Amino acid sequence: MKNIVLIGFMGTGKTAVGRRLAGRLKREFIDTDAEIEKVTGKTVAQIFARDGQIRFRSEEALLVRKLAGKENLVISTGGGMVLNPENVRLLKENGVLIALTADPEVICRRVKNKKNRPLLMRGDLRENIKALLKEREGVYDVAEHKVDTGSMSLDQAVENIIHFLKEHNYIE
């Protein structure tokens, strides 16, 4: 069975939804940021600070190549994973992409106390979020389905995804 790949901006709930969805579907859950941290022995913030965004994106690309050959996973990606068209191609080869969305205010509320968001660390948080969202406009349109996690509970988001997957014969 195809992988279920959650994409979307940081703070949209990919990890929380992914964990719950994997539990409901009895599938293995993979959080790409956590996997990269495990492989490198550094946090995402440390990789960005010490090695730069380019190094982090190359770690993402290596991981995607590894995951593309697997099945029955629920994969939660980093917010910028889909900036690389090759990542998108590989993830779509054996996966269905689901984009999680939320408005800037919801994202701001969710990430404001987290120190592991290197792209938001400088300047005004709300303005950084709005600028990055504008910069990434359309990037998440590669998904087969979108879920606004800002307008529903975690369980409602999971149910929405399961309904979509059943309706389109990705799961039984």
Swiss-Prot record:
Its cofactor is Mg(2+). Mg(2+) binds at residue 15. GO terms for molecular function: ATP binding; magnesium ion binding; shikimate kinase activity. Transmembrane segments: none annotated. Binds 1 Mg(2+) ion per subunit. HAMAP family: Shikimate_kinase (MF_00109). This is Shikimate kinase. It comes from Pelotomaculum thermopropionicum (strain DSM 13744 / JCM 10971 / SI). The lineage of its organism: Bacteria, Bacillati, Bacillota, Clostridia, Eubacteriales.
